[in-house]
Amino acid sequence: MSKQFILAIDQGTTSSRAIIFDKKGNIKKIAQKEFTQIYPKSGWVEHDPMEIWASQSSIVREALEYARVSPRDIAAIGITNQRETTVVWDKNTGQPVYNAIVWQCRRTSHICDEINKNEDLKKYIRKNTGLIVDAYFSATKIKWILDNVDGAREKAEKGDLLFGTIDTWLIWNLTKGEVHATDFSNASRTMLFNINTLEWDKKILEYLDIPVSMLPEVRSSSGDFGHTHPSTLGGARIPIAGVAGDQQSALFGHCCFEEGMAKNTYGTGCFALMNVGDKPVFSDAGLLTTIAWAEDGKPTYALEGSVFIAGAVIQWIRDGLGLVRSAEDSEYYATKIDSTDGVYLVPAFVGLGTPYWDMYARGTIVGITRDTRREHIIRAALEAIAYQAKDVLDCMKEDTGLDWAGLRVDGGAVQNNFLMQFQSDILQSEISKPKINEITGLGAVFLAGLAVGFWKDKEELKTILTTEKTFEPKKDPETVAHDYKGWKKAVQRSMAWAE
């Protein structure tokens, strides 16, 4: 057996995963391990970087062992990761100076408020990074660590500290410190990377007082990120050849290679991306402009809409409210009634993303009457996921003038047929669910496989992806418009709540 497999390292917000694929895209083995979510204060979210590395390395070894695959049988590794989450570590010891500050964390909202008072800087950041100023992105998280961790700024100015998003942290550990690099897609989510010049932006770095020496080298998403150190994976030196942030990786996994193709991923958050080609398109409707991936140093751009809370609202009604015993139960209860009877749940637990960008919005349930039951709340939670996706996808149509012949979907929540049908109804569009649900991991191995010749070209990749189920709209446009109007009203109730 020689080089018959390719490995995806899929490091997510709540779990570390390893997926072994064969050349036909079949999954040989998936291994997964959850890790600790740390909430030091209201609105703060952290992870332990050492626990992330320990969980990810152990789960890779477990996947290989259970699949009876030798590390030497792996042609390459593709890495995909939760984006924006920020790690700062000492390059001499390899030890983090603080916990990883997670993308969901709102602790730097006050820094963003100060930036937003500077209209010229705010516009500069929008035009050159493609992002809006928000605590979501890495830039202000790095500044917070440098300003609040004892000795961090002094060490950084001496050149002793390194920054990385999770991909960079994993690459550093896999290579035992030989490679400090990221890819274009992850770099474009830091609010420090100029997507026009394709370099770290000196003006933003200077304003935030972040030394450029901390930042990783930016490389093509499909290409050379070094090899695993023999001590990390059973003595083998496996090429790390594909890297992309989770949402961009999913776009690649869906084979959305042409301009105008779009996908929506339903995970902890909800993320829609549309391929807009080889030149950035800037949004008038609150969408982010981002780099989807880069090959041979040439980027493909995308528009993205980010919803902070999607699948996490189902976790909340299960764990927080105890309304269901499992996520799967939500579909059962939602289909026991014909509608929510005017109940809307807006899951703005950590603010609202696209197109509202309100850091101070908070969750709300409206329309409750004496007749409201468990089923109405559960159904409203599921519908909220679809409504938020519609908010984003409508903006994409508006900004690009492009429509799509259907939408490609993936993520844990696509197993919920009620949600997918409701999504098709309110979009008045076809929804396609692929047979392979591990699209994010597939995108990472597609990028890695192209780099090492495991697959020859994108046309071959398209033959691997097949559709399992298609959802067609069943509701009439008038009903959809009425229900969506109620959603927009509910969103207004949730906004500008926190201080």
Curated annotation (Swiss-Prot):
Catalytic activity: glycerol + ATP = sn-glycerol 3-phosphate + ADP + H(+)
Keywords noted in UniProt: ATP-binding, Glycerol metabolism, Kinase, Nucleotide-binding, Transferase
Highest taxon listed in the record's lineage: Bacteria
Residues annotated to bind sn-glycerol 3-phosphate: 13, 83-84, 136, 246
Record pathway: Polyol metabolism; glycerol degradation via glycerol kinase pathway; sn-glycerol 3-phosphate from glycerol: step 1/1
GO terms for biological process, alphabetical: glycerol catabolic process; glycerol metabolic process; glycerol-3-phosphate metabolic process
Transferase recorded as keyword: yes
GO MF: ATP binding; glycerol kinase activity
Binding site for ATP: 13-15, 268, 311, 315, 412
Protein name: Glycerol kinase
Upper taxonomic lineage: Bacteria, Pseudomonadati, Pseudomonadota, Gammaproteobacteria, Thiotrichales
